[in-house]
Amino acid sequence: MRLLPSSCAGALSLLCSLAIAAPTELKARDLSSFIASERAIALQGALNNIGPDGSAVPGAGAGFVVASPSKANPDYFYTWSRDSALTLKMIIDEFILGNTTLQTIIEQYIHAQAVLQTVSNPSGTFLPDGVGLGEPKFMVDGTRFNGPWGRPQRDGPALRAIALMTYSNWLIKNGQFAEAKTKIWPIIANDLSYVGQYWNQSGFDLWEETYASSFFTIQNQHRALVEGAQLAHDLGVTCTGCDQAPEVLCFLQSFWNGKYIVSNINVNNGRTGLDGNSILGAISTFDIDAYCDSPTLQPCHSQSLANFKVLTDTFRNLYTINAGIPEGQGVAVGRYAEDVYMGGNPWYLITTAAAEFLYDAVAQWKARHVLTVDETSLAFFKDIYPEVTVREYKSGNANSPFAQIMDAVTAYADSYVAIAEKYIPSNGSLSEQFNRDTGTPLSAIDLTWSYAAFITMSQRRAGQYPSSWGSRNALPPPTTCSASSTPGIYTPATAAGAPNVTSSCQVSITFNINATTYYGENLYVIGNSSDLGAWNIADAYPLSASAYTQDRPLWSAAIPLNAGEVISYQYVRQEDCDQPYIYETVNRTLTVPACGGAAVTTDDAWMGPVGSSGNC
């Protein structure tokens, strides 16, 4: 046998190092090279989708994050509060890590969100009760989107507050206390008021499909309130709504069913509840200082690990591209097994989130110098380290069982990144999904969230962790949960550029109309009031068919209108296949009651011609 020399020099040194390196080391080295390259591509991809200078989104306002340049099949050329906040959280973290060129975008986002908070929309108004903060998406110039949608969505305010609190903490540490207090805190305070007031009300989940209580939403709402209480203390101000944090944490425990996390509860939609929602929630509330038995359900928590295994295993035999991949190795991961959107495919952002989840867990175990394996998490560890038993493992030398398990979990995380790498095109562009049978990218191109998710995964793999958000200091949940609420206080953040809107006295008018429609047809109410679009069909108010039945084809919307106003209105049908709108043949009128008057409900029936599907 020919032995390799103990040392090498000159041009042979690289060859020598490669020869000595184990195959797993070479594989990790190759993956590291890919991640470094793709991370730069992903950052530029995200920046290309942010106005006003983003090359892919002409027309986007300053500081507005566009979900994707795609304008058809699907049309994602809008700004979502959730996607925007997650993207800015990534950008703020990159800024804190040293990329100072990003500060202008952060400042533009702050101004854009201050203004956006005050924009009246189909979810409601900003004043007096903040209900409009639950609107999920807007046009790319920051104006209201009036189309039918899954609204409200209650994660946006919490996620925006988290992003802005991260930046505020940096400002405080860098001698800019006044900037954080006078300019940014008022935006944060509005969002935290919304969370404290509405956390216990259902809303649509992050996939905009299920009206329920969402794990991802509740987990981020709790973090926002805990972090908000600490920031308020540091700034010497009051956090309205932050007192609700223990109740939110109490409710968070309701999602565990003994085997896995049910991502949406208080709903019966025929699904198992296994959903990428639960992985995304854990990584967005990751705290490097957290204890692994924390009720915040960190990545290293036994329930989170058990859920990770059950969830990812559901996709092993579901997608053709996962065929033959054994347990303990990464697979392409989608939203949920029952998904049919665009054919129900794996998503880049969830596949990289799976890797990030595992990197997070390893970081937490290493920070605590201990790993506790219990019956709940045992199956997760068995897949990647068969010798594992139910016991406590303490950190030791490089050959200790603790170190071996850390290496095994890290390699498992890397295998998810390798799956993403396999199906990312050579130019590094990231769409929303990739085909379950062929791996070909599909759905929205250049998805901003996909780019942001790749970067946050890259940060964790590189050992770059955000500062603690205070999970250790969070008040424990009460013994018995209570569906409580704290009325919010809402004030326009004028120091950040918000208009000084005022609250007029309004009365809720519920527009009910019986109108038989076909699938794909929508109804609007339009009228002389600005809240009803001022007769401009582009600004008409969408009605909801959530209570529609065959016996009663009800379309409805509750709209606050100015007290004493005389309203002229009619209903309009929006046809499919780009067919023209169909207007009623009558004009209706009503008078809004005086200030303090009782709410009014109409009982209308469609009068006029009806449409039919264009069968496109």
UniProtKB/Swiss-Prot annotation:
It is found in: Secreted. Coiled coil: none annotated. Substrate binds at W149. Residues 1-29 form the signal peptide. One of its GO terms (biological process) is polysaccharide catabolic process. Its main location: secreted. SUPFAM superfamilies: Six-hairpin glycosidases, Starch-binding domain-like. It catalyses: Hydrolysis of terminal (1->4)-linked alpha-D-glucose residues successively from non-reducing ends of the chains with release of beta-D-glucose. The active site is at D205, E208. Keywords: Carbohydrate metabolism, Glycoprotein, Glycosidase, Hydrolase, Polysaccharide degradation, Secreted, Signal. One of its GO terms (molecular function) is starch binding. GO terms for cellular component: extracellular region; fungal-type vacuole. InterPro entries: 6-hairpin_glycosidase_sf, 6hp_glycosidase-like_sf, Carb-bd-like_fold, CBM20, CBM20_glucoamylase, GH15-like, Glucoamylase, Glucoamylase_SBD. Residues 501-608 form the CBM20 domain. Glycans are attached at N200, N427. Its EC number is 3.2.1.3. Belongs to the glycosyl hydrolase 15 family. This is Glucoamylase P. It comes from Amorphotheca resinae (Creosote fungus).
